[in-house]
Amino acid sequence: MLKGRHLIDAMDFSIEELEEIFKLSNEIISREKEFSHICEGKLLATLFYEPSTRTRLSFESAMLRLGGKVMGFSEPGSSSASKGESIADTIRVISCYADIAAMRHPKEGAPKIAAMYSNIPVINAGDGGHQHPTQTLTDLLTVKSIKGRLSNLKIGCCGDLKFGRTVHSLIKAMSRYENNSFTLISPEELKIPNYLKKELNSKNVKYEETKNLEDSIESLDILYMTRVQRERFFNEEDYIRLKDSYILDKGKISRAAKDMIVLHPLPRVNEISYEIDKDPRAYYFKQAKYGMYVRMALMIKLLGIQ
């Protein structure tokens, strides 16, 4: 039963509960009009302390398509946070107005704090470089829809593996399924955090670290590309030096299997050449559409409507 629950971490839900969400997502995809009034009278609060286009609009369009309404803010300067109000007090007040909340915050753990003080379900829409669980649900639904399975896959994660919260959530989630392995492709400065490697080791999940995309791409079922995130760098010189570390182009993808799929949480900067968009293995825009449907299903479940 997911009614009244929070989603803060990709591991908050069991595999069985995730399957419930994926099943409902597919029902919405196939019969969307039947769900167009299911959230009438419900209000989503979008509390975005950090800039976002895709995630915020995905949440908002999800609720609007379900017949509900949306309120919130898209930057801290337009909220009482600019006056020094705490997250705890903000969510207490929001709980008086809304039925469910989606929060993005630059500080790791902020949505967890909000959940502790909230009387309504809180969804983590990204906290610093930590977690992005609804993107993970999006990624899993995309993989399941295209590959037909979430196990026995070789997953390549490429780019910013240090600050990339989408990658952290994806690795944690996919490591729960049988016989998945990871190829972690990044420059030395942007390697995956040690705590994630310890988790993989504790589960006996196979992984390898490399700096070479060309030699790794041939054996992958999934290539998950990420951008180097300018907003996580304190030194502009370091960002400029690392931002072009990996660019997926025709030459590199020509070495990949015909049934490999390329995913990206977006926004893209230049890590995927535009010429790849027409390649049948490019699924990142379809992935974005799946994100709206999975958020529709998630909110229905957390609100206990179905």
Swiss-Prot record:
InterPro entries: Asp/Orn_carbamoyltranf_P-bd (IPR006132), Asp/Orn_carbamoylTrfase (IPR006130), Asp/Orn_carbamoylTrfase_sf (IPR036901), Asp_carbamoyltransf (IPR002082), Asp_carbamoyltransf_Asp/Orn-bd (IPR006131)
Pathway given in the UniProt record: Pyrimidine metabolism; UMP biosynthesis via de novo pathway; (S)-dihydroorotate from bicarbonate: step 2/3
GO BP: 'de novo' pyrimidine nucleobase biosynthetic process; 'de novo' UMP biosynthetic process; amino acid metabolic process
Reactions performed catalytically: carbamoyl phosphate + L-aspartate = N-carbamoyl-L-aspartate + phosphate + H(+)
Gene3D superfamilies per UniProt: Aspartate/ornithine carbamoyltransferase
Signal peptide as annotated in the record: none
Cysteine pairs bridged by disulfides in the record: none
HAMAP family: Asp_carb_tr
Similarity field: Belongs to the aspartate/ornithine carbamoyltransferase superfamily. ATCase family.
Primary role: Catalyzes the condensation of carbamoyl phosphate and aspartate to form carbamoyl aspartate and inorganic phosphate, the committed step in the de novo pyrimidine nucleotide biosynthesis pathway.
Protein's recorded name: Aspartate carbamoyltransferase catalytic subunit
Source taxonomy: Bacteria, Bacillati, Bacillota, Clostridia, Eubacteriales
